[in-house]
């Protein structure tokens, strides 16, 4: 299936769905050998797919677990640039729906996930209070997870260099 993304000249846009997975005071992120940062569990929404279906699919693909959605938590407008990889040199604009996933009560996961460029991914449980010590995206996650929220948050970040 085709992701909802496109490139026009030096601009790249993607519609993304991601899960916020918290177990025992830790939040789940993913890393890989190619990148020097961690990123949230999720990926591009496919054409004709709802964001809820996309987050269920991606969370399962990346963790091997069928987490249930608790609620839509954040709509994130993200502007950034990449210094390497497939997006090198592009001005990136991403709109992401972040869903809080229901905890399972355990952190045991089996991942056999790869990036679009076929690089093996590794799951990382990061203690929420230590998240600021990591280069992890989205950058708002530690602040979001340490405050109470009753509705859907709209967050805009601009990390273009």
Task: Go through each PLM region and give its residues.
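Short, charged/polar surface micro-motifs in flexible loops or helix N-caps
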Residues: 25-27, 35-36, 46, 75-81, ...
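Acidic, metal-coordinating catalytic segment for phosphate/diphosphate chemistry
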Residues: 1-18, 24, 89
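Conserved Nudix-box catalytic region and its N-terminal flanking loop in Nudix hydrolases
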Residues: 23-65
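Nudix hydrolase/Nudix homology domain
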Residues: 33-37, 108-161
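Active-site-adjacent beta-strand/loop module that shapes the phosphate/pyrophosphate-binding cleft
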Residues: 80-110, 144
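A short coil-to-beta-strand element that immediately follows conserved catalytic motifs
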Residues: 66-75
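A generic structural micro-feature
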Residues: 11-13, 87-95, 115-120
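Short, well-ordered beta-strand micro-motif
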Residues: 21, 98-102, 125-127
């Amino acid at each position: 299936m085709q992701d909802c993304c496109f490139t026009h000249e030096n601009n790249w846009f993607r519609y993304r769905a991601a899960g916020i997975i918290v177990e025992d005071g830790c939040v789940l992120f993913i890393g890989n050998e190619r990148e020097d940062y961690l990123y949230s569990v999720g990926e591009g929404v496919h054409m004709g797919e709802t964001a809820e279906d996309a987050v269920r699919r991606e969370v399962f693909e990346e963790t091997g677990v069928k987490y249930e959605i608790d609620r839509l938590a954040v709509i994130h407008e993200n502007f950034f640039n990449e210094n390497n990889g497939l997006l090198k040199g592009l001005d990136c604009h991403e709109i992401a729906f972040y869903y809080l996933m229901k905890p399972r009560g355990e952190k045991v996961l089996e991942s056999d996930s790869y990036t679009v460029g076929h690089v093996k991914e590794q799951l990382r449980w990061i203690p929420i209070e230590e998240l600021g010590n990591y280069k992890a995206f989205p950058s708002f996650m530690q602040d979001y997870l340490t405050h109470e929220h009753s509705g859907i948050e709209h967050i805009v970040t601009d990390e273009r260099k």
